[in-house]
Structures are given as structure tokens and as C-alpha cells.
Swiss-Prot record:
GO molecular function: flavin adenine dinucleotide binding; tRNA (uracil(54)-C5)-methyltransferase activity, 5,10-methylenetetrahydrofolate-dependent
Name of the encoding gene: trmFO
EC supergroup of this enzyme: transferase
Organism, scientific name: Prochlorococcus marinus (strain MIT 9211)
Single GO BP term: tRNA wobble uridine modification
Recorded catalytic activity of this chain's protein: uridine(54) in tRNA + (6R)-5,10-methylene-5,6,7,8-tetrahydrofolate + NADH + H(+) = 5-methyluridine(54) in tRNA + (6S)-5,6,7,8-tetrahydrofolate + NAD(+); uridine(54) in tRNA + (6R)-5,10-methylene-5,6,7,8-tetrahydrofolate + NADPH + H(+) = 5-methyluridine(54) in tRNA + (6S)-5,6,7,8-tetrahydrofolate + NADP(+)
Protein name: Methylenetetrahydrofolate--tRNA-(uracil-5-)-methyltransferase TrmFO
Binding site residues for FAD: G11, A12, G13, L14, A15, G16
Family listed: Belongs to the MnmG family. TrmFO subfamily.
Keyword Flavoprotein: yes
Cofactor(s) needed: FAD
Cross-referenced InterPro entries: FAD/NAD-bd_sf, MnmG-rel, MnmG_N, TrmFO
């Protein structure tokens, strides 16, 4: 197989795996480059594709939530990765969380066994030739050599921020005499383990977090202390203020241990309710592994063990994985990309995933779907798909590719990653004050326009006699 007969995809993370599958589903050969395990990254632990290095959650399931809406759009588009996430989901209240080992193993097995996908376990150090259709989905941990070549190609200094992952605890080591099962506001089943704290416990815990020794940054990381606001280390939250954690990952609202008594009794509620609550979310289907929700950290491992064992119920916690922090690299996309995810200066070069400046697992999958589908369309000589801004996938890709959609003050500042959120969608034509109803209206409009845009493109494809386009769900 000649390289000219195939599409090159760099990186087998969430975006790269999705892109590879969409290209192959269109009947086109793929050369998929993945440097692991030949060259390790600072955050990955395995050689599997689509390894989840931070949380195991893809966010809210409900389509009237931003991440849930993007998931629903991807289900309609028959996303390979979201289908696998649904297949390997674990209980998580109203969220889509997965058994990360089974999920990644499933993705890896399906891709490596696909007859149209050739996997190359080598580091691609330079961009392929201009004639080669290529999707760069190398992720936020892009290797130094490729990042340098991208910087030379774009002529723009790389952007980066620090990201971190939470520790994982062995379930059998959690003491349920001090913790309880339950979901916030009793949504779904009792899918979380909750560790309540009184005020004295919380303040002592915060003090020790602030005093705890952090892991030393690598030389290339010391020049910056930028954090992505959606994934701040817990010790950074502790430093920001006495109540910051209580209004963030440790918020106690909506959580009640039945052993405390009648929730409807005002006196009991006032006396017993927790001052703060640490939540643990199930990592695997069997419930043997639990991650500390929102506890991304860069503390030294010994300090993690010492401080986190102050949490009620975790006095004897067995740490299966400690938290880590690493630097994430991304492109200054508004200066470089179109909403089709093509580079403006090279139409056959596309980018997808977190390297484009979208944040979160579902956004990475969406970018992979769009870049892979558009790469296939380019190979067949057709125009790429650009989704309307009223869809979540379209809103995100327009937002990262158009400076005009950012406020004047934001345009003056450096580009920062953007997760799925309703703020990037255009306003509704009618004002709806009630939040849930407003979000439901965004959802309905987005799904209607997504389906219409796909129908229109499919009709065009049928008119032109193209039978190899990906099959969409009706």
C-alpha cells in the first residue's frame, strides 16, 4: 500500500482513534502512528489506545447538559468511541463513566484488527509531506520533536497549561463506617462513596494540603505555572481560599447519610449535615477501584498518602494509583484552523482533539469524528463538513477557529482551552428564564440542526453517487 493511497493519523488517543475509525469506515486505508510503548508520555500508564489519563468520566449523560448534548450528537453520528464508552459504562449517577481498562482494551482491539488500519508503533517526529492527507491528533502530550516541527510550521510559539490526574483507591480499603453510598440529590443509584467532614476536620485537612510538599517540576515546565481552570490541582484550590474547595469538589449540598436521621427534620438537618464531602467515583465494573473526584494533584506520593488519609473513611486507604501533574500543549487554533479543522495554510493537514484547544474527553472525540470524516471527504474530492454553530460540535469548532467569537478582552489575552458549555452556543430567538427549560431548548435546536445538516450532506453524497461515506444513524 502506497502512502498516497492512505490517510495518515498521528496519535491513537480519543481523537485519533475516532478519526481512524471514521476514515476506515469510509473505505479508505489509514496509517495510524502511536509512539507508545516505544516512547512513554509523562501521564500514560499503558500502550492501549484511547487511554484515559485523568478522570474516567465523560461528563453528564443528560442531553440538557453541555457534555451530554455533545455525547448525544456523537451518538447520532455513530461515534465509534462513544459507542464503546456506552458499552463499558459503570454506575456514576447522572454521568457517563467507564471501566477505563475495558474501554481502552476494546478500542485497541477493534482498531488493531481492522483490515483498513495499519498501526505503526513509532514516533512521528516531523509532519508528512504537503501532498499527504494527515490528521494531527497527538494530544496534549505531543512529543518534543513533533511539537517543535509544528511550531516551525505554524510560526507560532506553542501554548500550554498544566493538567493533573486524581489518585485511585482500592475499594476494599475504604471504611464505610465513616463514609456512605449515595448520589447528589439521590439522582440515579447510590453510585458514589461519600466521605463527610465536619468543620474542624475540613480546616485541618486544608491546612495540611497547603503545607504538603509538591513534586518537583521538570526543567521544561518550570517557566510556567498556568493551570486549566477546569482541572485545577486540589492543593491549588486549597490555596485560593478557605471555602474554595467547599464550593467546588467538596461541596456538601445534596448529600445525606441515612444514618444521620430524617432529612426532612430541620433540627436534625442543621445538627448533622456535613461541612464538606469528599466523593469517590467507581472506576471499574466490579467496584474494586474508586477515584477521588476533583482531586487532581501534584503532591509527592508520600504526601498524598499522608494527607488524603486524613479524609474520614480513607484512614487506611490503599492507593492503586497516585495523582500526577503534567504539561499539556495545544495550538493557538484561532490563528491556524478553519471550522472544518483544516489548517488554513495547508488544506490537507487537519488537527483534532485537545491539541486544538478543546477541553475534555467528549470534545476530543468530537474533533476526531469531524477531522476523520473531513479527511475522508477530502480524499474523495469533496468539500468538508462544517457544522452549524447552533450544534455543540459546531459551536466548539467555530469558537476555537474564529477570533471574532471571542470577547475583545479575550482576544487580547492568550488562547485558553474551551470545554463544551452552553455559553458558546448562539442565543435562543426567544428568552427562556428557567435554566433547565432554556438548556432543553438549546438541546432541541442543536439536535434538529445536526440532523438537518447531515441529511443535506447525505443527499448531496447520494446525488454524486458516493457510496463510501460513513453511515449515519437515522
Amino acid at each position: 500500500m502506497n502512502q498516497s493511497d492512505s490517510i495518515t493519523i498521528v496519535g491513537a488517543g480519543l481523537a485519533g482513534s475516532e478519526a481512524a475509525w471514521q476514515v476506515a469506515r469510509a473505505g479508505i486505508h489509514v496509517e495510524l502512528y502511536e509512539m507508545r510503548p516505544l516512547k512513554a508520555s509523562p501521564a500514560h500508564h499503558t500502550a492501549d489506545f484511547a487511554e484515559l489519563v485523568c478522570s474516567n468520566s465523560f461528563g453528564a449523560l443528560s442531553a440538557d447538559r453541555a457534555a451530554g448534548l455533545l455525547q448525544e450528537e456523537l451518538r447520532y453520528l455513530n461515534s465509534f468511541v462513544i459507542n464503546s464508552a456506552d458499552k463499558h459504562s459503570v454506575p456514576a449517577g447522572g454521568a457517563l463513566a467507564v471501566d477505563r481498562s475495558r474501554f481502552s482494551a476494546d478500542i485497541t482491539e477493534k482498531i488493531t484488527s481492522h483490515p483498513l488500519i495499519t498501526v505503526k508503533r513509532v514516533e512521528l517526529q516531523k509532519l508528512p509531506s504537503e501532498e499527504q492527507i494527515t490528521v494531527i491528533a497527538s494530544g496534549p502530550l505531543t512529543s518534543k520533536n513533533l511539537a517543535e516541527d509544528l511550531k516551525n510550521f505554524t510560526g507560532i510559539q506553542e501554548c500550554h497549561f498544566f493538567d493533573a490526574a486524581s489518585p485511585i483507591i482500592a475499594g476494599e480499603s475504604i471504611d464505610l463506617r465513616f463514609a456512605f453510598r449515595g448520589s447528589r440529590y439521590d439522582k440515579g443509584d447510590a453510585d458514589y462513596i461519600n466521605c463527610p467532614m465536619n468543620k474542624k476536620q475540613y480546616l485541618s485537612f486544608r491546612d495540611e494540603l497547603i503545607k504538603a510538599e509538591q513534586a518537583e517540576l521538570k526543567d521544561f515546565e518550570k517557566s510556567s505555572s498556568n493551570f486549566f481552570e477546569g482541572c485545577l490541582p486540589i492543593e491549588e484550590l486549597a490555596r485560593r481560599g478557605e471555602d474554595t474547595m467547599r464550593y467546588g469538589p467538596l461541596k456538601p449540598i445534596g448529600l445525606w447519610d441515612p444514618r444521620w436521621g430524617d432529612l426532612n427534620n430541620r433540627e436534625i438537618r442543621r445538627e448533622k449535615r456535613a461541612y464538606a464531602v469528599v466523593q469517590l467515583r467507581q472506576e471499574d465494573r466490579e467496584g474494586k477501584l474508586w477515584n477521588l473526584v476533583g482531586f487532581q494533584t501534584n503532591l509527592k506520593w508520600g504526601e498524598q498518602k499522608r494527607v488524603l488519609r486524613m479524609i474520614p473513611g480513607l484512614q487506611n486507604a490503599d492507593f492503586v494509583r497516585f495523582g500526577v501533574m503534567h504539561r499539556n500543549t495545544f495550538l493557538e487554533s484561532p490563528k491556524l484552523l478553519n471550522a472544518s479543522l483544516q489548517f488554513r495554510k495547508r488544506a490537507k493537514l487537519l488537527a483534532a482533539g485537545q491539541i486544538t484547544g478543546t477541553e475534555g474527553y467528549v470534545a476530543a472525540v468530537a474533533g476526531g469524528w469531524l477531522a476523520g470524516t473531513n479527511a475522508a471527504l477530502l480524499a474523495m474530492g469533496h468539500k468538508p463538513i462544517i457544522f452549524p454553530r447552533n450544534t455543540m460540535i459546531g459551536a466548539l469548532t467555530h469558537f476555537i477557529s474564529d477570533w471574532e467569537l471571542r470577547s475583545d478582552s479575550n482576544r487580547k489575552n492568550s488562547f485558553q482551552p474551551m470545554p463544551p458549555n452552553f455559553g458558546v452556543l448562539p442565543k435562543l430567538t426567544t428568552q427562556i428564564k428557567e435554566k433547565r427549560a432554556r438548556y432543553a431548548a438549546y438541546r432541541d435546536r442543536a439536535l434538529d440542526e445536526l440532523k438537518a445538516s447531515i441529511r443535506n450532506h447525505t443527499c448531496l453524497a447520494q446525488e454524486l453517487g458516493i457510496s463510501k461515506l460513513p453511515i449515519y444513524r437515522s
